């Protein structure tokens, strides 16, 4: 018990309390924070995130939202040959009808929130990745932790 308290005190004095309370090893902690420096070029939405206690949760959420975005936008692109406001809007009402009920709920929530910006991106000829990054749903280039 005394050893643990001493280690806790030493870590606090060294100015790294996040490492102590997250129970990460120093090597893993450095890898977990490494993407924050690299993302300024490839993913601006993560460059603004600071090192916080729930870093892994935020990264996992971004990954799931990003995959959802890519899937929906790619399905929309397949459904629409020449994207116009009307054709994308019609396809958007059909895209969430396929799949399981959980997927439908996720898809409907996504479309309710982002449909206008996704439509603008498709009409402008952007790729699915560009649209999802514009929505600030990008994931780190180092991959999931």
From Swiss-Prot:
Q: Where is the signal peptide?
A: 1-22
Query: Which cysteines bridge via disulfide bonds?
Result: 69-132, 96-107
Q: Which residues form the Saposin B-type domain?
A: 62-142
According to its UniProt record, how is this protein modified after translation?
A 9 kDa form is produced by proteolytic processing of a 15 kDa protein.
Question: What is a single Pfam family found in this protein's UniProt entry?
Answer: SapB_2
Q: Where in the cell is it found?
A: Secreted
Checking SUPFAM superfamilies in the record gives: Saposin (SSF47862)
Give the UniProt keywords, A-Z: Antibiotic, Antimicrobial, Disulfide bond, Fungicide, Secreted, Signal
Q: In which tissues is it expressed?
A: Expressed in natural killer and T-cells.
- Give induction info: By T-cell growth factor and IL2/interleukin-2.
Gene Ontology cellular-component terms for this entry are: extracellular region; extracellular space; phagocytic vesicle lumen
Q: Which InterPro entries match?
A: Granulysin-like, SapB_2, Saposin-like, SaposinB_dom
Against PANTHER family, the record matches this protein to: GRANULYSIN, GRANULYSIN RELATED
- Task of the protein: Antimicrobial protein that kills intracellular pathogens. Active against a broad range of microbes, including Gram-positive and Gram-negative bacteria, fungi, and parasites. Kills Mycobacterium tuberculosis.
Protein name per the record = Granulysin
What is the species listed in this Swiss-Prot or TrEMBL entry? Homo sapiens (Human)
